[in-house]
A protein has these predicted regions:
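Transmembrane beta-strands of outer-membrane beta-barrel pores
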Residues: 36-40, 70-74, 135-141, 154-156, ...
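Extracellular loop and loop/strand-boundary signature of outer-membrane beta-barrel proteins
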Residues: 37-40, 103-107, 134-139, 149-153, ...
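Hydrophobic, lipid-facing positions within transmembrane beta-strands of outer-membrane proteins
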Residues: 30, 48-52, 115-119, 146-150, ...
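Outer-envelope beta-barrel architecture signal
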Residues: 26-32, 60-64, 115, 127-131, ...
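Outer-membrane beta-barrel translocator/channel fold
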Residues: 67-117, 162-218, 229, 313-329
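Outer membrane beta-barrel transmembrane domains
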Residues: 86-106, 226-228, 232-270, 286-299, ...
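Solvent-exposed loop/turn segments connecting transmembrane beta-strands
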Residues: 39-47, 109-115, 137-147, 257-261, ...
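Outer-membrane beta-barrel translocator domains and adjoining extracellular loop/strand segments
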Residues: 45-49, 67, 77-83, 136, ...
Length: 329
């Protein structure tokens, strides 16, 4: 079960020098921010999310930031099975039980809590070269995740072009809440055959180019490539074996491939209109992987400015995706 997703901000500093003195001092101004999100879908899911962040200069060429996230999700999620009146199922919270008569075995309840911390350090090596170093970890009821990343941004002398190159690595441990294990793929749910914790490693590389076309227009192009190896299966998902009439005979734990290679290309155009200084933001993204999944995303936002502090920003997003090669018809 995957879900949900990320955003940040900036700070200032002053360099003070005194007459003939060679020493320099940094006025270390830190910014702090906090936010709370509540989201609910009737008879489906409820989300509570609390975020705290701080960022500031630690030297004339270095900035540091920390972000802490606490969120909880509860509700119901599809199991992958067809509707049933009596077969066993495993819930997304890790608990197992029998679907009561008259209820749908295609849904199960879940209750998940996550705590995450992200650290960032940015160093200005030269006037036109900055490198960001990142580290993060998160702990959930059924997952532990650790990641590191480094991204270099190089500008030309006029700062009208910026090249970006980044690499990231992630290590995940996946398990079910009760038992700290994962079901053996493609085995009957009724047999309750389990293995140890699942492990997955992921490596991602991104290359990008940002260009200032004119004083009101910028364009951006990003290419990304990623490889994941290890446990790729959702330990709570099952599928049903049915007869020609659609009546369920049995349930099996799902089993996905143990590797995945993916790539994407994204293009973005930002333009400020004249007169009015309204903002136009157009983004297109194409994604493909070796599971035969392909997707197209088109996103457009238009910001209408009213006075100095007020604005209205309608947004439209179009998305299409096909199914994986192993997904049943």
């Amino acid at each position: 079960m995957k879900s949900i997703r990320n955003k940040l901000s900036l700070a200032t500093c002053s360099l003070l020098t005194t007459g003939n003195a060679a020493a320099e001092a940094i006025e270390n101004a830190w910014e702090t921010d906090a936010s709370y999100l509540y989201y609910s879908e009737v008879d489906r899911v409820t989300v509570n999310k609390l975020v705290g962040a701080a960022k500031g200069f630690v030297s004339a060429k270095d900035t540091a930031s920390i972000k802490v996230v606490f969120d909880s999700m509860s509700g119901a999620t599809p199991t992958g099975a067809v509707n049933s009146s009596s077969l066993s199922y495993t819930g997304a919270s890790g608990g197992s039980g029998i679907t009561p008569s008259g209820e749908s075995g295609a849904l199960s309840n879940f209750d998940d809590t996550r705590v995450g911390v992200a650290l960032d350090w940015a160093h200005e090596h030269t006037r036109t070269l900055t490198v960001n170093y990142n580290g993060a970890f998160s702990v959930e009821n059924d997952r532990r995740s650790f990641s590191v990343a480094a991204t270099a941004n190089k500008e030309n002398s006029s700062r009208s072009l910026r090249w970006t190159l980044g690499i990231a690595g992630t290590y995940d441990q996946i398990f079910r809440v009760n038992g700290n294990n994962t079901p053996e793929p493609l085995t009957r749910v009724e047999d309750q055959r389990f293995l140890g914790e699942g492990e997955r490693t992921t490596t991602d590389v991104i290359a990008g180019l940002t260009s200032v076309i004119n004083r009101r227009t910028t364009a951006q192009l990003n290419l990304s490539f990623g490889i994941a190896n290890g446990y790729m299966t959702d330990p709570y998902k099952v599928f049903s074996i049915v007869d020609v009439n659609g009546v369920e005979w049995d349930q099996y734990f799902e089993g996905r491939p143990d590797s995945r290679m993916r790539w994407s290309i994204a293009a973005k155009l930002n333009h400020m209109t004249f007169p009015g200084n309204n903002g136009m933001h157009l983004t297109y993204r194409y994604y493909s992987d070796d599971w035969d999944i392909k997707s197209h995303t088109l996103d457009y936002a238009h910001r209408f400015i009213f006075g100095n502090a007020d604005y209205l920003e309608p947004r439209i997003r179009l998305y299409t995706q096909n199914k994986a090669e192993f997904y049943p018809n």
